[in-house]
Design a protein with these regions (language model features):
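Short-chain dehydrogenase/reductase
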Residues: 2-88, 101-102, 112
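Structural signature of the Rossmann-like NAD(P)-dependent dehydrogenase/reductase core
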Residues: 11-12, 96-97, 142-149
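Short SAM/SAH-binding signature in class I
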Residues: 92-93
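Helix N-cap/beta-alpha junction loops of NAD(P)-dependent oxidoreductase domains
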Residues: 99-105, 153-156
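Substrate-binding pocket helix/loop in short-chain dehydrogenase/reductase
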Residues: 105-106, 110-115
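A short, exposed helix-loop element centered on a Lys and neighboring polar residues
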Residues: 129-130
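Catalytic loop of short-chain dehydrogenase/reductase
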Residues: 137, 145-157
Length: 157
């Protein structure tokens, strides 16, 4: 694997979990990491914020940029992408990591929850790709990585 030294990653949902792990791995190579997530304020039920993630990225050897961003909102995505480009000069890799999951069956899924999953998992990933693509096309080796929420490990079809 080649180094991510000097590359810029725009990672959604990077304040915790898999997104944070990807950010820290990239930081160890010296990458610039834009942490785009809704978690600007600490939540006692969920670890991490965009600010703690940016600090961890810096401690790991990269440059971190904390961006409060709800990826369902086009204006917020566009502003976060613009801030990333203004700060780091471009975007090399988009990691669509943010997701909404609901590990219940169809009959137990309220439409409000279904709509949230579609808005985050589909619309949000599309919005981020659409906003990042003009900048990715200027990068020498651009990538878009889209992760999916984990499927139930005990399916009942």
């Amino acid at each position: 694997m080649s180094s991510l030294q000097g590359k810029t990653l725009f990672i959604t949902g990077a304040s915790r979990g898999i997104g944070l792990a990807i950010a820290l791995r990239a930081a160890r190579d010296g990458a610039n990491v834009a942490i785009a997530a809704k978690s600007a304020v600490a939540n006692p039920k969920l670890p991490g914020t965009i600010h703690t993630a940016a600090e961890a990225v810096k401690a790991a050897g990269g440059q971190g940029l904390a961006l409060k961003c709800d990826i369902r909102e086009e204006d917020q995505v566009n502003a976060a992408v613009a801030a990333t480009v203004d700060t780091f000069g471009g975007i090399d890799i988009l990691v669509n990591n943010a997701s909404a999951i609901w590990l219940r069956g169809t009959l137990d899924t309220p439409m409000k929850r279904f709509d949230l999953m579609q808005q985050v998992n589909s619309r949000g990933s599309f919005l981020c790709a659409q906003a990042c693509l003009p900048h990715l096309l200027q990068a020498p080796n651009p990538h878009i990585l889209t992760l999916a929420p984990p499927p139930s490990l005990d399916p009942k079809w």
